[in-house]
């Protein structure tokens, strides 16, 4: 689920396995709060809506959709993700929470959904992991959305956890080593999200852009730093280095210090953290 660029199998003994369960613990309520902030722009979902949760992950977007609807029997959610483990967890949550959802393992760039089938499409923090900035997936969403249908997408204008990871990498690895999630900062500019939408087939006059702050509650700073470095630290083209095991504690301390200096950082009761993110949100009509 962490989309590594390297095929190297080595990892430090301290590194936690990047499972869907670790992902859920790491992001806390981040993806659900991002989804809530995004779908707030397009509510309500009328009866008969067929809503597409693309890049659904373990179900944060669907959870936000369901929470916004009084009669869930009146809607249908179609969810896809390319990660089979994520789909397995999604299906477990769907069954446990009685979601009106169908989930399949699919590539968002080549969907099996018929043309003009969907009334709505929601894409939460998924474009940046796709080739060509997700343009091919955007074309598929355009194809499957009904004329007059509504789509909502987002990207991060500010994240408090990327600088700490990259600072740890710079300070504990040889000069010139590729940075984890290098190039992610290009998504801070909302113009990139808008460009991808337009290249996908949508018309500029039907796109509305905005920004929203998203406040996220997660675990203690110690646990969060361990999860963050485990999940993302080895995802660059260099993968994990053998020296990372020796310098693990140093990297964790750097991450913790950088997090404490981030905008909006707050330690809550019970040692939990509140972190502030800022999202670019795009609402578009077909």
Role assignments for model-derived ranges:
Residues 2-52, 60-68, 86-89, 93:
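Conserved class I S-adenosyl-L-methionine
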Residues 43-45, 69-70, 130, 145, ...:
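A generic alpha-to-beta junction signature in SAM-dependent methyltransferases
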Residues 50-111, 136:
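Class I SAM-dependent methyltransferase SAM/SAH-binding core
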Residues 109-121:
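A short acidic, Gly/Pro-enriched loop at the edge of an enzyme's catalytic core
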Residues 119-134:
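A short SAM/SAH-binding and catalytic strip from SAM-dependent methyltransferases
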Residues 135, 142, 146-221, 278:
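Conserved catalytic/acceptor-binding region of the Class I
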Residues 187-192, 196-199, 203-286:
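Conserved Class I S-adenosyl-L-methionine
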